[in-house]
């Protein structure tokens, strides 16, 4: 029996009607900030994803206010590459979001299963993510926690970015949650590590780290501690993918460098600029390496 099915038998929310509308049917996943359930919207007769914040995040009225404010901001983003937010509320003192339920997986699961991607596939996901970020940034919404776990990959259609606003709701209260630096440290922009301040370029940095990982099969400095990794983000340039994979074209190295320049002033100015660079890199990829990918250990090879 899977862990989630076991939790279904003990979780008090399973079977409960939330807000006189959402019938919780099963637990989908548990993350650092919330537990995600599948629920049935009994009013509109459709399945939805119900994300319930962990209790320790709702210990102050200030957090609850920030949570609702950021949820409203996220709900304004209407784009095929952004997971839609339908509703919000409070259950047993814990804030919740009602979101679009995606039939598919996430980028982390795909990387775990396959190790690394070909250049065209990595650039396709990068394009999807940047197009979603462009829409959000134009609405004044910064994600702050771009990482593979927050990139959902449907069975059809573009990849979708999830959890807009949640990281900011937490970070305005504290840089730390349950002893860990907010935002997965492997993807954190230098300015967030230093000051917790972020803008659109901070999200682009995280996209650059994900692109590096999609190509090489690992994030930079993967074998070091969280504090050491944060220090590298602040003090060191992200290595070129070609340092690990000599066959990677220079245009890909240049793209990763443009996204991950430590000084935001010298980074890609916005998602539109980044998309132009991605298109150029895609057009310049030689056909004889288009199907190559890094040979790394992964679940499918075990």
Where are these regions (language model features)?
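Protein kinase glycine-rich loop
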Residues: 24-31, 36
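AlphaC helix of the eukaryotic protein kinase fold
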Residues: 54-76
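Activation-segment/catalytic-loop signature of the eukaryotic protein kinase fold
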Residues: 88
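Conserved short submotifs of the Hanks-type protein kinase catalytic core
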Residues: 92-106, 110
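Activation segment signature within eukaryotic-like protein kinase domains
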Residues: 125-126
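Protein kinase catalytic-loop region centered on the HRD/HxD motif
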Residues: 129-141
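C-terminal lobe helix-coil module of Hanks-type protein kinase domains
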Residues: 186-285
